[in-house]
Amino acid sequence: MSEAEARPTNFIRQIVDEDLASGKHKSVHTRFPPEPNGYLHIGHAKSICLNFGIARDYQGQCNLRFDDTNPVKEDIEFVESIKHDVEWLGFEWSGNVRYSSDYFDQLHNYAVELINKGLAYVDELSPEQIREYRGSLTAPGKDSPYRGRSVEENLALFEKMRNGEFAEGTACLRAKIDMASSFIVMRDPVLYRIKFAEHHQTGNKWCIYPMYDFTHCISDALEGITHSLCTLEFQDNRRLYDWVLDNITIPCHPRQYEFSRLNLEYAIMSKRKLNLLVTEKIVEGWDDPRMPTVSGLRRRGYTAASIREFCQRIGVTKQDNNVEMMALEACIREELNENAPRAMAVLDPVKVVIENLTTGVEMVTMPNHPSKPEMGSREVPFSRDIYIDRADFREEANKQYKRLVLGKEVRLRNAYVIKAERIEKDAEGEITTIFCSYDPDTLSKDPADGRKVKGVIHWVSAEHALPAEIRVYDRLFSVPNPAAAEDFLTTINPESLVIKHGFVEPSLAAAQPEKAYQFEREGYFCADNRHSSAEHLVFNRTVGLRDTWAKIGA
């Protein structure tokens, strides 16, 4: 990571500065605690950049800890993908990877301590009854009939829960706090529930599993976390976080701070809804280039640096706000405009025959970047038969159309001026071939007689071009806030993926997966990291040359 990316300013960093200056903490210790029940998305990337970035900038530590307390929804596949995403984004965690399940024995002991203090009880209400008894924002809850059990009875029942003597959903351990609290999270929250499921780390050792709110704070304390950073939806949960730590024997009491979550327009961040997109086969998988997942963005052609830059630009605040998709797209567009080598690709080809070109193949020198000579150049074959894009030719056009028109001239990029003389069509009236002449004295220079040729179009040699599948990706949803729709699936953009079969210049034969290029006049593309091969080239559009959605929203 470059120095330019370092040291942003936000309210959390101000808190860290104050804590270090006052001596409250001698060093900084943060953590990133994802649940391994799905792939990380751009919202997680914001949290990663915040937690790991603070640890890096203050020469502290940041743990990677998996909040693995629900074996039913978790999988080792997600564990491995999350580790890969964190490393790909450019960060390293401190020490070994940690798991909340590492602390299951200690968590059980702390639960027993709460029971012994009369602060937890085994409840045999059904989950539906617990919800009913909890009350609402306007009505207080009411006590469970099992709330008054003795310490001895609760200890015995909790042991039975651990031994598998209760069926799932028939008993749970709850904190004894205040059923009339104005904060619903404090109305005797569940601490442990029963799940007969094999755990990816602990196997079948446990059939009771701690809840997030009980696990999270204790794990932070056991690891000596100094600043526990969460998104705003956990603001009320801070009361429970502090209550648990205040009522058990543990030397460390971290402080939780909340920041705004990332709400990205034209995207969905809910894991449940993202999973639905996958299971309903609306997308190819979690790494579909239209998904807001880190793996999807990577496959689409986003770089780690562009995602870090985006997270720095949007900042860290206490107020939820919506971020425009164009802000994310601008970060990768700016980077690729600066760094991506140029290449020519024809997405919707029509054949051009240059009738007065009698020589064989000529190699034309092209710069890899128009403003960076240090990136070198390449030799591109030019021959009698070429392909141009169908949109670059019209039989008739007005003066604003600066491409190839029947009877008029246009320049081929870094090559010659050609003139459309006649066309050939098939039985359906579709143009199959454009017959042209060329001016042999115009290789990368103006005509000698001073005539003006305004348009420039790209091309590839028909003999040497490589067939390629070109996937033109766009925003997955057609409205800025798909989550607000009654059925978010009805807002899917039908044009979010358009597959074209075109041709690319031969220099792209060995394009490496995720390698970015600017296809001149088309946009930024990369070789697909799943399907592209030397035998079958597949390129994904990362982003267009300019923001076309800005016109739609105007």
Curated annotation (Swiss-Prot):
It comes from the Bacteria. Keywords: Aminoacyl-tRNA synthetase, ATP-binding, Cytoplasm, Ligase, Nucleotide-binding, Protein biosynthesis. Disulfide bonds: none annotated. A motif ('HIGH' region) lies at residues 34-44. It is found in: Cytoplasm. GO terms for molecular function: ATP binding; glutamine-tRNA ligase activity. CDD domains: GlnRS_core (cd00807). L-glutamine binds at D67, Y212. InterPro entries: aa-tRNA-synth_I_CS, Gln-tRNA-synth, Gln/Glu-tRNA_Ligase, Gln_tRNA_ligase_bac, Glu/Gln-tRNA-synth, Glu/Gln-tRNA-synth_Ib_cat-dom, Glu/Gln-tRNA-synth_Ib_codon-bd, Glu_tRNA_lig_a-bdl. Pfam families: tRNA-synt_1c, tRNA-synt_1c_C, tRNA-synt_1c_C2. It is an enzyme of class 6 (ligase). ATP binds at residues 35-37, 41-47, 231, 261-262, 269-271. GO terms for biological process: glutaminyl-tRNA aminoacylation; glutamyl-tRNA aminoacylation. A motif ('KMSKS' region) lies at residues 268-272. The keyword Hydrolase does not apply. Belongs to the class-I aminoacyl-tRNA synthetase family. This is Glutamine--tRNA ligase. It comes from Serratia proteamaculans (strain 568). The lineage of its organism: Bacteria, Pseudomonadati, Pseudomonadota, Gammaproteobacteria, Enterobacterales. The gene is glnS.
